[in-house]
Amino acid sequence: MANNTGSDSKNTLYCSFCGKSQHEVRKLIAGPTVFICDECVELCMDIIREETKSTGLKSADGVPTPREICKVLDDYVIGQMHAKRVLSVAVHNHYKRLNHSSKTDIELSKSNILLIGPTGCGKTLLAQTLARILDVPFTMADATTLTEAGYVGEDVENIILKLLQASEYNVERAQRGIVYIDEVDKITRKSDNPSITRDVSGEGVQQALLKIMEGTVASVPPQGGRKHPQQEFLQVDTTNILFICGGAFAGLEKIIAQRGKGSGIGFGAEVKDPDARGVGELFKELEPEDLLKFGLIPEFVGRLPVIATLTDLDEAALVTILTEPKNALVKQYQRLFEIEGVKLTFTADALTAIAKRAIKRKTGARGLRSIMEDILLDTMFELPGLEGVEEVVVNEEAVNSGAKPLLIYTEVTKKKDATAS
């Protein structure tokens, strides 16, 4: 009903869907012979949003299949196929468990995940990408800042507070979220021997994490507990929150190698070269007892039944990381130069040289950006003030010997320079 009859309402327009007049709503949008108000538009958007969520690329039970999860991970993370498969299956089973928890008498246990791998190999990126795929609240916590309650540092409950903030204080949504705890190898037991001094940042933190990882109703202060002690607490059940712990575990490979050596005494003893296999190969033979020797307490290891090990990134993988993923570094810098109207090109030799420098630094993929910044810093400083630059070419000399990248000028600029001289 676009118009109502009557002398007073001759010039008044009405929403064709809900019948409200233009004076009762904030906005009335006109179409051919019909009108729609802003309230009806919002209602339609909500309906479409709900439909999109329920009819996405999902398996029969409403959860992405492991193959679908792995395929999306491939777009962002290069290599690490074993870790991707382990994560895909674990996450699929976790959310399948939530969706079918009330349909059977059999209670399915939660499977938290432990990611072990050298720095810069993709542990954090895997966790972030998983949260993006599943459209659930996600938060990251640094285990090195955590302490037992009552000591200087962050309480374990602050992790749940960050998850609540990520879900815009929607408790139900937060209770299905993902928490990634980084640097978990830094909270290992400081010593096997009992000490007079309390270990508040090592074993103490492991003990504090046990309850929220297993499942408990945590009382979370919305504004942080220490500065606002009088506020009301929110109750958050952590039973269905998926915890992913990650760490480099430097030195763990030596414990694994030592266990695998066996006896080294006698004429029949087998002599093995400790450097014959890489860190990634040794991590594949990881047993829970190795983590106990490293300094994790048995109860903490027991809360992390799914273990995914990641390997060092080789030269070919680093070159691929530079060029192929959706947010590849080369694509990012090319976009920056494109804004200046300049094409940025890297030669194949230059990309290989950058990968070699990253391997030498032992920083993995994380070190690639700092190397790129070093190479392009002077060029990015001078480029906005230069005229007629058409292309910047980064070659092997620019990476290895500190030479400036090549600047290619347009033909017009070359002719101007020739006539001026």
From Swiss-Prot:
Q: Does the keyword ATP-binding apply?
A: yes
The answer, when asked if Protein biosynthesis is one of the entry's keywords, is: no
Q: Which CDD domains match?
A: RecA-like_ClpX
What SUPFAM superfamilies does this protein map onto?
Glucocorticoid receptor-like (DNA-binding domain), P-loop containing nucleoside triphosphate hydrolases
Residues binding Zn(2+) are 15, 18, 37, 40
Q: Please name the GO terms that the record assigns under molecular function.
A: ATP binding; ATP hydrolysis activity; ATP-dependent protein folding chaperone; protein dimerization activity; unfolded protein binding; zinc ion binding
What does the entry list as the binding residues for ATP? 118-125
Query: Its GO CC terms?
Result: HslUV protease complex
Per the record, a Pfam family?
AAA_2
Q: Which GO terms describe its biological process?
A: cell division; proteolysis involved in protein catabolic process
Function, please?
A: ATP-dependent specificity component of the Clp protease. It directs the protease to specific substrates. Can perform chaperone functions in the absence of ClpP.
Q: Assembly state and interactors? A: Component of the ClpX-ClpP complex. Forms a hexameric ring that, in the presence of ATP, binds to fourteen ClpP subunits assembled into a disk-like structure with a central cavity, resembling the structure of eukaryotic proteasomes.
The protein here is known as ATP-dependent Clp protease ATP-binding subunit ClpX
Species annotation: Cereibacter sphaeroides (strain ATCC 17029 / ATH 2.4.9) (Rhodobacter sphaeroides)
The opening ranks of the lineage are: Bacteria, Pseudomonadati, Pseudomonadota, Alphaproteobacteria, Rhodobacterales
